[in-house]
Amino acid sequence: MRLKGQNFRILVYDTTATKFKCIGMATSCTVNLTANTDDASTKDDVGGSAKPEVTSNAWSVSVESLNVVDAGAMLTAIKSMTPFTLMWDETSTTDNQSIEEASYARKGQAYLNDLTLNFNDRENSAKSLQFTGTSALEKLTTTPSTDTIAAGSYTKGQFVRLFISDSSNPALVIAGAKTLSLHVSLSLESATTKDTPGTFDVQEPTGYTYDISSNALVASNETITSNVDGQTLATLMDFYEASTLMYWQIANVSGANQRTKGAVICSGQCRISSIAVNAANRQVATYDTSLAGYGDYSVGS
């Protein structure tokens, strides 16, 4: 019988519970193992083929999952620049979580170096995680302590919105918004030296950047329409032209038009880095707004 995808899981070591736990609500995962090579062919070799020699090894893991309540924890983790202990293994078909200690199971240290949170209208909110290895991979020699996780709660994308303005407590959403994405990237540099044992690359974090993007509908005659109770293409263009330092919050929302601010997921300051208007024939006009994060963001209220 062939292994089904739901029974190949990525587990993260929980330092509080001192146990490995599966990444919750995952929909897919990928493990990449890379051998970096250098051509060792010389003038002494007969023929025209290269002779690749392995100079180092690298590995990475990516996970797609529904965006559950651990979004704040992931936002905190990536900017803490602290490596995780990861493991991948086959899991039991009874719960898709209990490990089977497959011969290909491995564990190692890795940085969460890329995080994307997506909150799109009428879609399940989702997140993408990218981990880059910073240690050798180890085979399992003893049975690691593991724990199962309960199914997490997730929400539809329309119930999370971006609030943005030039005041420190932004109260206006982007009117007519369709999509919202927050992307955080941790910069890594190779810290491998002649003193490093083995062949696996070692990484060192140097800093992080983040950006926010949104797509929204353009309202006809919006510049002369009465109050639309939200930021529009016109107001955002004014902020862009003034090079205004903006304040933003991504928060849960409720109410008839999903504009009543609830719990804040994260917040910070930004600059409007680009605005692109999309106007195709016989299609609704939209515009894309990109925000470049300014300074550290905060998690929670």
Model-identified regions with their sequence ranges:
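Extended, low-complexity, intrinsically disordered tandem-repeat tracts enriched
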Residues: 63, 86-90, 131, 214, ...
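Charged, amphipathic alpha-helical segments and their flanking helix caps
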Residues: 2-3, 89-93, 100, 142-161, ...
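Short beta-strand-to-coil "C-cap" segments at the C-terminal boundary of structured domains/repeats
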Residues: 133-139, 293-301
